[in-house]
From Swiss-Prot:
Pfam families: GSH_synth_ATP, GSH_synthase. Belongs to the eukaryotic GSH synthase family. PANTHER family: GLUTATHIONE SYNTHETASE. This is Glutathione synthetase. The modification N-acetylalanine is found at residue 2. Binds 1 Mg(2+) ion per subunit. It comes from Rattus norvegicus. Mg(2+) binds at residues 144, 146, 368. The modification Phosphoserine is found at residue 415.
C-alpha cells in the first residue's frame, strides 16, 4: 500500500521540520491531553500522540465497516434485551470472574425490581483490523465492540485538519482532499440529545460519570460542548459524588444535588480497578433509576468478550435477529475465529490448539481499557496455568489477525519523531436510541483510526501504545 509521501520518511531534516508543523497544528486544533504528571489539571497540556501522515486503508473495507455498524447497533440492543441469552452465556464466566459477576448481580437486582428506564441509549465503537491473506487480499475482521466509555470521538473529530495541513505543506493538495471529514463527537452528542429529549423534562441534566484523574478531558469536553450548543447542560461527577449526594424519588427519578438527571453517560466504570464498595453502591443506584443510562448494565454485559465469542456460534445470530438474513451475513463476514474456554471437550480442544500453535491465537479476559490480552509465550504460560482450572472459563481465545505492515512516523510528546513499521485498528462509532420497544435512532457517526508499531502486540492510545491517525483511502 504505497503512498506518494513514502520517500519523505527517509529525509530526516524534512521529517523534523514537518513534524514540528504538524505538532503546532495539532495543538491549535485542540488534539490535546492533560499531562501525565498532573492529570487532574488543564494548567499544563500536551498534544495527543498521532501519526505524521494518514495511513492507507482499503476503501472497500472502510465502506464495509460503515455498512455493518447499524447491524451491530441492532445486535447489541437485541442482546441487551435477552436476559435468558445473557444468563446462559455468562453462567460459566461469573463463577470465576468477580468483576463480571458483580455487574451481573446488579443486572439481576434491577430485573427483579423491574427496569425503571424507558429510554435506552447506545454509544458504541466497533473495532477492526485488516487480515492480510497469503495472496495479498485483505478482509475486515472485528477485534471487539466497546459498549461502555467508547473514547476518542472528540479528538478524532479534530485530527483530519492536522493531516490535511501536513499534506498541503507538501503541496499534495489532491491527496489532502481525500482525507475524510469526520465528526464523531457531534453524532455521539446527537444520540445523548435524543435520549434527553425523549426523557421529557426540559430542566433535567446529563450526568457524566468521570474519573478524578482524567487526561483525556478534551475528548469528553467536545461532546459536552456539542450538548451545551443544544442548550443541554452536563454535570461531571464521580461515583463517590453519586454515593454521597445522589438520590431517587418515589418514582425512581434520579436527582443529583436536587437536579433531575435525564441521561447518565459513563466515562468511568469499565474496569475492576475503578470500583470500590462505595462505587458499586453508586452504580446500583444509577441502574435502579429511570434515567437513560449510556450504557445500562445489560448493554455493558452485551459488550463482554464472552458474549462476542458466543455470537459467533452457528445459528445464534439468526435466533437473535430473526428475518434479517442480510444483516446476519454482513455481521458474520466480519467475525474472526472465536473459541470458548468453558470446561469440557470444546474448551479442551481450544486450549490444545492454542498451545500447539500459539502464534495463531490471542487469549482475552473479560476486560476493557486495552493492554489486557496475552500473546505468544506469555499466552502459553497463562494457558499452562489455566488449562485444568475452571478459571479458564473467564477467558476466550481469538484467532490472531495478521495485517500488512506499512511505514509511518509516530509523534509522541517528549520523544523524537519515530519512523517505524506499523499496523492500524479502525473503529466505527455507532449510536442508537430506543424508546420502549421502538428504535427511534440508529446510525453510524464517524470513525477512529489508531496506529502502533508492529512490535506492540496490545494496547490503545490511553494505554500509551497506539497513536491517533486518519485513514487514507486506497
Amino acid at each position: 500500500m504505497a503512498t506518494s509521501w513514502g520517500s519523505i520518511l527517509q529525509d530526516e531534516k524534512q521529517l523534523e521540520e514537518l513534524a514540528q508543523q504538524a505538532i503546532d497544528r495539532a495543538l491549535a486544533e485542540g488534539v490535546l491531553l492533560r499531562s501525565a504528571k498532573n492529570p487532574s489539571s488543564s494548567d499544563v497540556v500536551t498534544y495527543a500522540p498521532f501519526t505524521l501522515f494518514p495511513s492507507p486503508v482499503p476503501s472497500t473495507l472502510l465502506e464495509q465497516a460503515y455498512a455493518v455498524q447499524m447491524d451491530f447497533n441492532i445486535l447489541v440492543d437485541a442482546v441487551s434485551q435477552n436476559s435468558a441469552f445473557l444468563e446462559q452465556t455468562l453462567s460459566s464466566t461469573i463463577k470465576k470472574d468477580e468483576y463480571t459477576a458483580r455487574l451481573f448481580d446488579i443486572y439481576k437486582q434491577v430485573l427483579k425490581e423491574g427496569i425503571a428506564q424507558t429510554v435506552f441509549l447506545g454509544l458504541n465503537r466497533s473495532d477492526y483490523m485488516f487480515q492480510c491473506s497469503a495472496d495479498g487480499s485483505k478482509a475486515l475482521k472485528q477485534i471487539e465492540i466497546n459498549t461502555i466509555s467508547a473514547s476518542f470521538g472528540g479528538l478524532a473529530s479534530r485530527t483530519p485538519a492536522v493531516h490535511r495541513h501536513v499534506l498541503n505543506v507538501l503541496n499534495k493538495t489532491n491527496e489532502a482532499s481525500k482525507i475524510l471529514s469526520n465528526n464523531p463527537s457531534k453524532g455521539l452528542a446527537l444520540g445523548i440529545a435524543k435520549a434527553w429529549e425523549l426523557y421529557g423534562s426540559a430542566n433535567a441534566v446529563v450526568l457524566l460519570i468521570a474519573q478524578e484523574k482524567e487526561r483525556n478531558i478534551f475528548d469528553q469536553r467536545a461532546i459536552e460542548n456539542e450538548l451545551l450548543d443544544r442548550k443541554i447542560h452536563v454535570i461531571r461527577r464521580r461515583f463517590e459524588d453519586v454515593s454521597e449526594r445522589g438520590s431517587l424519588d418515589q418514582n425512581r427519578r434520579l436527582f443529583m444535588e436536587d437536579q433531575e438527571v435525564a441521561v447518565v453517560y459513563f466515562r468511568d466504570g469499565y474496569m475492576p480497578s475503578q470500583y470500590n464498595a462505595q462505587n458499586w453502591e453508586a452504580r446500583l443506584l444509577l441502574e435502579r433509576s429511570c434515567a437513560a443510562k449510556c450504557p445500562d448494565i445489560a448493554t455493558q454485559l452485551a459488550g463482554t468478550k464472552k458474549v462476542q465469542q458466543e455470537l459467533s456460534r452457528v445459528g445464534l445470530l439468526e435466533a437473535l435477529l430473526p428475518g434479517q438474513p442480510e444483516a446476519v451475513a454482513r455481521l458474520r463476514a466480519t467475525f474472526a475465529g472465536l473459541y470458548s474456554l468453558d470446561m469440557g471437550e470444546e474448551g479442551d480442544q481450544a486450549v490444545a490448539e492454542a498451545l500447539a500453535a500459539p502464534s495463531h491465537f490471542v487469549l482475552k479476559p473479560q476486560r476493557e481499557g486495552g493492554g489486557n490480552n496475552f500473546y505468544g509465550e506469555e499466552m502459553v504460560h497463562a494457558l499452562e496455568q489455566l488449562k485444568d482450572s475452571e478459571e479458564r472459563a473467564s477467558y476466550i481465545l481469538m484467532e490472531k489477525i495478521e495485517p500488512e505492515p506499512f511505514r509511518n512516523c509516530l509523534l509522541r510528546p517528549g520523544s523524537p519523531a519515530q519512523v517505524v513499521q506499523c499496523i492500524s485498528e479502525l473503529g466505527i462509532f455507532g449510536v442508537y436510541v430506543r424508546q420502549g420497544t421502538t428504535l427511534v435512532m440508529n446510525k453510524h457517526v464517524g470513525h477512529l483510526l489508531r496506529t502502533k508499531a508492529i512490535e506492540h502486540a496490545d494496547g490503545g492510545v490511553a494505554a500509551g501504545v497506539a497513536v491517533l491517525d486518519n485513514p487514507y483511502p486506497v
